[in-house]
Amino acid sequence: MTEQQISRTQAWLESLRPKTLPLAFAAIIVGTALAWWQGHFDPLVALLALITAGLLQILSNLANDYGDAVKGSDKPDRIGPLRGMQKGVITQQEMKRALIITVVLICLSGLALVAVACHTLADFVGFLILGGLSIIAAITYTVGNRPYGYIGLGDISVLVFFGWLSVMGSWYLQAHTLIPALILPATACGLLATAVLNINNLRDINSDRENGKNTLVVRLGEVNARRYHACLLMGSLVCLALFNLFSLHSLWGWLFLLAAPLLVKQARYVMREMDPVAMRPMLERTVKGALLTNLLFVLGIFLSQWAA
């Protein structure tokens, strides 16, 4: 493989951002574990949900790079990494083609998912609509005349799609019913995913402000955005604790608290370090902290049933 080919391959990997996929998978795994807890586990539905969620995450990553590059938001002096389009290695036409291919793959996996999982016409149509909204949300975060990521609505979108829809959707497609208690672990997943976005926006606050990208961090300001970050992390722990207290009722259900010292340490670091450059290593650490919390929660669910 030539150096130029390696450069292009690396550029595409940077745009695809495979390291973000575990966070997309985590919410589906949580929803599936909850379905298993209630005796509704369907491995084929779970697999198709994981594939669809992963493809939606890739679509969001590609669209984010495309939108920011077209708008000129990602400049050489930004703290975060420059990706394929910003480097000039990937053209607009190539990225558009990649977006179209990814949307087609999402449609195929999504159709397979609802065909296998949905037993009524209402469910089939309802999840087709939710799937369409997910595609639109993934693209319009940075793409379009008024992308919602530029007006501070990215956080609520992450909470909805990476929390509520992913967890409760994957549960419903296997259980075909909803229970009110699901809102707690679903919110916890959403808050942890939102914390990852918040770190990204804290890192890029100066370049975003200069380029008119009014993320929630820009709107809140550096101090309040750091307080908000601590609330996201601690809020996720509170939600999981309430779920165990009122629904799971198991000592194993507290296993997620093993991640609490790590989340507290991360919150304290973010509160203390005011330099945006200091947020660069925190992005990967926040992803790992969120993933660890979710996986410990899932393990607690499994152990609570085996120990019963």
From Swiss-Prot:
Q: Which keywords fit this entry according to its UniProt record?
A: Cell inner membrane, Cell membrane, Membrane, Menaquinone biosynthesis, Transferase, Transmembrane, Transmembrane helix
> What GO MF annotations does this protein's record show?
1,4-dihydroxy-2-naphthoate polyprenyltransferase activity; magnesium ion binding; prenyltransferase activity
> What InterPro entries does the database record attribute to this sequence?
MenA (IPR004657), UbiA_prenyltransferase (IPR000537), UbiA_sf (IPR044878), UBIAD1 (IPR026046)
Please name the pathway: Quinol/quinone metabolism; menaquinone biosynthesis; menaquinol from 1,4-dihydroxy-2-naphthoate: step 1/2
List the ranges whose topology is Cytoplasmic: 1-20, 64-97, 145-148, 198-227, 271-286
Task: Answer yes or no on keyword Cell membrane.
Answer: yes
EC primary class: transferase
Topology in the lipid bilayer is annotated as:
Multi-pass membrane protein
Localization in the cell: Cell inner membrane
Q: Which GO terms describe its cellular component?
A: membrane; plasma membrane
Q: Which residues lie on this side of the membrane: Periplasmic?
A: 42, 119-123, 170-176, 248-250, 308
Could you provide one GO biological process annotation from this protein's UniProt record?
A: vitamin K biosynthetic process
Q: Which Gene3D superfamilies match?
A: UbiA prenyltransferase
Q: What is its main location?
A: membrane
Family membership: Belongs to the MenA family. Type 1 subfamily.
What does the record give as the function of this protein?
Conversion of 1,4-dihydroxy-2-naphthoate (DHNA) to demethylmenaquinone (DMK). Attaches octaprenylpyrophosphate, a membrane-bound 40-carbon side chain to DHNA. The conversion of DHNA to DMK proceeds in three stages: the removal of the carboxyl group of DHNA as CO(2), the attachment of the isoprenoid side chain, and a quinol-to-quinone oxidation, which is thought to be spontaneous.
Q: What is this protein called?
A: 1,4-dihydroxy-2-naphthoate octaprenyltransferase
